[in-house]
Every structure is written in structure tokens, then in C-alpha cells.
Amino acid sequence: MKTLLIHAKHFEYEAREKALDAAESIDGNRSGSFENALVVFVTVEKGDGSSQDVVEEAAADVLDVFRRVGASRVVVYPYAHLSDDLADPEEAKRVLSQLAERISSAGVPVSRAPFGWYKRFSVECYGHPLSELSRTIKPGRRVRPGYADFAVMFPDGRIVGIEELRAEELPEDFVALLEAEVFKKKREGGEPKYLEYCRKFGFEWEPMSDLGHMRYGPEATIMLDAVAEYAWQCARSLGIPVYKVRGTNTFNLSFKPVAQHAQLFGDRLYQMEVDEKKLILRYAACHQQFAMVKDWEISYRDLPFGAFEVADSYRLEQPGELLLCFRLRKFYMPDLHVFCKDLAEAMEVSFRIHSKIYEEIRKLGRDYVSIYNLTRSFLEQHRDYLKRLVEMEGKPVLLHFVPEGKYYWVINVEYNIIDELGRPREIGTFQIDVGNAERFGITYVDENNTRRYPVIIHTAIIGSLERYVFAVLDTAAKKARAGEVPSLPLWLSPVQVRVIPHSSEYLKLADSIADKLEEQGIRVDVDDREESLAKRIRDAEVKWIPYVVVVGKREAESGKLTVRVRGQGQYEMSLEELVGRLVSELKGYPRVSAALPRYVSARPRYSP
């Protein structure tokens, strides 16, 4: 049996004509209209009638959901479209009748729509986390309803089962996370607007490579360089020594630690054979950093410390899952591993990482909803630690329980934004790894001159470079949807200031302004094209250039510049005031060179 349970604010149906010769008699039951009803769409499958367990299990499940959602009645609605393995009509009618009777015997009002009729129906779903559920119940197999692998932890330390949740105490974004991760609800499709913005800045698929591989045009490369530098800056801000390293992306499976670590990622690894050697492309920076750090002589006095690399990473994602700037087969991961003396030190360091991850997403005007993947034993032994993490978030988190000993980590936190289309998208992450130090032979010498295995934190504070860009562009898409002007942060904009002279007569003045701005590390260009002023201003707006400076006779005589600030308006200010404003806005962010010709007229035409 397959069931689809909808908690409906309003539900109505009307039987129109017979679909089967064995259709039930109407007998005044041609239509029905109900408020606050739990509507149970039921497909009876072959063999359901041979086992009373099926009816008992289905009824128990319906009654459980009925009580939790606070419905006023149950409507059993025959629905043949949830399975291809249909019971014969007589068996189906018998099972449906038994199901309704079993629910009714529990004192619950039940209505049953007629079997074997074409029916019109309309439903208005409440839309809370328990309002759309589906079940599969097989003969001879008792299936306990519920979601035993999940729970929710609140900032006050309460842990609540999924079935006990109340929608009114949950933030909207968290409900979206529950619907996707627990109830597997699919959001409506459609092309997200951020893809248009990807094309605008030169983030594209490379058609001459494998699926899932990108290319980055000049503007996209400036943005990616800025994000890479910023990721390094974030890593260094944690208050511990961090060493930047580099290495290879190819590892030999004949080495036991490489092979063991590779097994954790299954069929998502790129593999190749060269000179009769089986090689893999790295999944992240783990292989290289661990292979390197195992050769270091480490004292307990050196801990904690980090190793950092922006690693070209390779994951053989399914073709249907690929999404530009988000789910890729090749991407850049600013991977930080923090080596700690023990689990206690790792948990203490993780608070800094947790705080930094939230600080960075909030700089974009966004917030996360989190999934804590962990074992039940870790929950029981470290409940206070988890409570502190959740308190720092200030909102509930989803706990996902995994089998003991299956993974190299004891906790894996996934930080999700809810995108423009209402879907969770993981950006940042951290894990506490208790297995890889021993696997790779990484040790340190403790206070008693004993060699020990460190505990390792894996983290990508701002996510992969591409996913951070995704978060920025999705934020712009949300702004556009809200009727605001979409924009990039100033530090990330490929061109931060464009100077537009009224005519060639003022090109020298435009150049002198650009010189002053470049001295401050500001990316500036000059639109010297023989186009109308209006067209050049419009082109700057199309390219989302944050500051546009127009210079002509008035500006030359007055010493005041006419400055258009994207999304804010037009201002008059001196060059010194403009520089001061830009320097202030860029404080704390990296300065990356423009790598573009100053004159717009000197550039070839390409998509951005």
C-alpha cells in the first residue's frame, strides 16, 4: 500500500462518472466538502488484502499523524496513481473499507470517497512540516511510522522528535530545510535567476571538457581571485597559526591511506590508470595536506595549527545534479584543516570556526539553517557542547543521526542558505575528524614525550569559491525579486569605479582620477569609447559597476565629481571624498588587481 497524507485547510470532491465496472455505488456519496481534514490518498497494491498487518499499520500511521496535526476528521480517498502494481478492484474495495473502519474504531470521524469513479477534487494544504507525508507499507513487514534518524535541537537545549514539532515555533527557512531533508519534498522547478548573473560575469560551462567543468572569463577570474584571497584572510583570522601549502591533485591508490580515504567517497571519485598505476583525482585538499603533515615533526606546543590550500577538487557528480557555480565536477575548495591535541581542544576551536562561518554569511545579508550530522553517542556524551553551538546560532538546528563508526568524523555540520527558489543550498561546513590522523600516520609528541594522533577539524569557512559566488549571486537574485537593485559587494566587483569623460577633451582628467584611485588599490577603468554619454552610463549600469564618475566641463571647473552609486543615487563629492568613501567600504577586504586594460575601447568583445 502507498499513501499520501495531506493536512488540508479545505478539501472537496465530486464523483463525475464511472471509471470501472466494479465501481462502488454512490448512494448519496457523490460529493463531499471538508475543513481541517487529514486527506489520505490511498493506492491499494497486490497482496495488501492478504495481510491484516497492512491495514493495521496504515491505520496506526494515519491516527498518529491525525493527532499530531490536530485535524478534525480523516478523509480516505481511493487514488490509483501512486503505484503501477494495483490490487484487483474487489481486493482494493475491501482493504479501503477495512482501513476506514479501523480508523473509525479509534473514535475518529471518517469519510470515504467512492472507489472506481472519475472524480474532481480540490485541496488547500496548510503547508506546515507535517502537512505533506507519504508512506509505503508492505505485507508482512511492520513499519514504525516516524523519522527516527532525525530530531530538532532548540537553543534552550530541548531536543524534539520530528513528529512532535509544531510549525508555529519554527522559522520559515528552517521549515524549508525540514521539507527538503526530512520529508524529501521537491520544490517547483524553473531556472533560477542567478544563472543569468553567472553569464553576466563570465561564469560558464566549458563545452569542450567533461560535464560539470567550468571556465572563468576575465571578470569571473577577478572575482574568483578575490574570493580565494578572502578565504585565506578568513583562515588567518581564527587566532591560530595557519600555514599555506600547495601540492598535487593526483594520488596513487596503491598507498593504503590513499585507498582507505578514497573508499569513503565511493563512486564519486575521478579515477584513471597511467603507467599501470591506478590514480585518483583528489576530492578536496585532505589527501595532500595529510600526506604532507605526516612528515612534520610536531610538538604539543605547536598545536593547534592549520594547513590551508585553495585546492582544485574533483567529484564525479551525477549529470542530472550538476548546477553552475554550485554542484560541479571540478571546483576550487579553500580547504582548512586544523590539527588539535584532542577532542576537547577541537571542540573549543570549533566554536571560533562556527562563529566565523556565521559572521561571513551575515556580511552578505544572509543567514544559515544548519544540519548537525552526528552519532547518538556523541549527542549523549557532548550535549552541552552541542547546546552551546545551537545557542550561538540562536535558532533550531536539524540533528541527523548516523551509524556509529561509519564515518571518520564524529560531527559534520552543514550550513545551508535557502535560495531564491526556496531550496536549501549548503555553503559552509566543518567536521571533527577522529580517524584520518591514524590512517595517514600523523602524530605529535605530548608533554610526556608520547606520540599521539591529533584530532583534525576540516572546514571551508565560506564554502568552495564557486559556492561563495553562488551565495552572492543568489543574494542579488533575492534583491531583484524583492524589487531592489541587484548588486555585488564592492570588494568583489570586477570593476569598482568607472570614469566616463563627456568627450575626448576630458580623457586626460579621467586618467588622472583613475591614477589616484589605482594608487589606493581600487579597480578602475575609463570608458573612452566614441558613444553617447547616456549609452556609456547605461552600459555601466548593465555591468553593475558600483561607482560611476562622470567628468566634463563642470567637474573640471568646480573640482567636484558627479558620482552615481549603484542602488543609492547620484552625489557630488571631491576626489578625496570619493577615495575616503571607497577605502572605508573596502576596509577588511582584499585588494586584487584588475587585470583588465584601463580603456574600455581596448578590450575585445566577449559575453560579459
Curated annotation (Swiss-Prot):
The keyword Protein biosynthesis applies. Binds 1 zinc ion per subunit. Belongs to the class-II aminoacyl-tRNA synthetase family. Keywords: Aminoacyl-tRNA synthetase, ATP-binding, Cytoplasm, Ligase, Metal-binding, Nucleotide-binding, Protein biosynthesis, RNA-binding, tRNA-binding, Zinc. It comes from Thermofilum pendens (strain DSM 2475 / Hrk 5). It is an enzyme of class 6 (ligase). Residues 192-489, 193-489 are annotated as: Catalytic. This is Threonine--tRNA ligase. NCBIfam families: PRK03991.1. Catalyzes the attachment of threonine to tRNA(Thr) in a two-step reaction: L-threonine is first activated by ATP to form Thr-AMP and then transferred to the acceptor end of tRNA(Thr). Also edits incorrectly charged L-seryl-tRNA(Thr). Zn(2+) binds at C286, H337, H458. One of its GO terms (cellular component) is cytoplasm.
